[in-house]
């Protein structure tokens, strides 16, 4: 990794941590609040690509593991990885990787702005929602003993917010391509 890669990776790890400072939104009818940190995961994949995006998420999870309160609500420590929602944290790594991988394959400089934005959106939807939820729901169903159907239905309340996050990540990805053409290729 070059110095630029290290700086960009650390920057996006810091962005994910900073998004954890935003207060979580409680809906009342579900016990788990909506947080902004999954937006950071999508943004890391879209802007940095598969490898650097996944590394940025790994840095955040390492900070969590050593006990720093960098998750939404000031949470941190190894106990987080034993909670029923730990599958979503593990899913962040793969979500950022898949989002980045798809962004690298679907988006190029020769496309129109609309095609680039839609491609970034699809990458964020697949990596940041489908992959993330596959890990999170499977782990939640297993650890909490809910069964897959209950865990799946309970998680659907988060989909509208995550779609909005995917739109924001797509718009950011397009803005970075236009505004910073010298940013190293996503890899």
Swiss-Prot record:
Pfam families per UniProt: BioY
Subunit: Part of a biotin transporter complex composed of BioM, BioN and BioY.
The protein's name: Biotin transporter BioY
Organism per entry: Rhizobium etli (strain ATCC 51251 / DSM 11541 / JCM 21823 / NBRC 15573 / CFN 42)
Membrane topology: Multi-pass membrane protein
Keyword set includes Phosphoprotein: no
Keywords recorded for this protein, A-Z: Cell inner membrane, Cell membrane, Membrane, Transmembrane, Transmembrane helix, Transport
UniProt gene name: bioY
Main localization category: membrane
Protein task: Involved in biotin uptake.
Family of this protein: Belongs to the BioY family.
CC terms in the record's Gene Ontology section: plasma membrane
PANTHER family: BIOTIN TRANSPORTER BIOY (PTHR34295), BIOTIN TRANSPORTER BIOY-RELATED (PTHR34295:SF4)
Compartments where found: Cell inner membrane
GO MF annotations, alphabetized: biotin transmembrane transporter activity
Record's note on what induces expression: Expression is repressed by biotin.
InterPro entries attached to this UniProt entry: BioY
Knockout or disruption consequences: Mutant exhibits lower biotin uptake and has a diminished capacity to form nodules on bean plants.
Transmembrane feature ranges: 10-30, 53-73, 78-98, 120-140, 152-172
Taxonomic lineage of the native organism: Bacteria, Pseudomonadati, Pseudomonadota, Alphaproteobacteria, Hyphomicrobiales
């Amino acid at each position: 990794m070059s110095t630029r890669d290290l700086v960009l990776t650390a920057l996006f790890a810091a962005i994910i941590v900073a998004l954890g400072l935003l207060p979580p939104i409680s809906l009342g009818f579900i016990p788990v609040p909506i947080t902004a940190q999954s937006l950071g995961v999508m943004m890391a994949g879209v802007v940095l690509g598969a490898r650097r995006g996944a590394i940025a998420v790994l840095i955040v999870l390492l900070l969590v593991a050593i006990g720093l309160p960098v998750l939404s609500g000031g949470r941190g420590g190894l106990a987080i990885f034993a909670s029923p929602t730990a599958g979503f944290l593990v899913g962040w790594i793969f979500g950022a990787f898949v989002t980045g991988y798809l962004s690298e394959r679907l988006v190029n400089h020769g496309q129109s702005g609309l095609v680039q934005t839609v491609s970034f959106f699809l990458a964020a939807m697949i990596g940041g929602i489908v992959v993330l939820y596959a890990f999170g729901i499977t782990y939640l169903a297993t650890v909490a003993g809910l069964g897959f159907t209950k865990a799946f239905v309970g998680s659907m309340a988060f989909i509208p917010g995550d779609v909005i996050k995917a739109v924001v990540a797509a718009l950011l990805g397009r803005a970075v391509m236009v505004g910073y053409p010298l940013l190293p290729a996503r890899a």
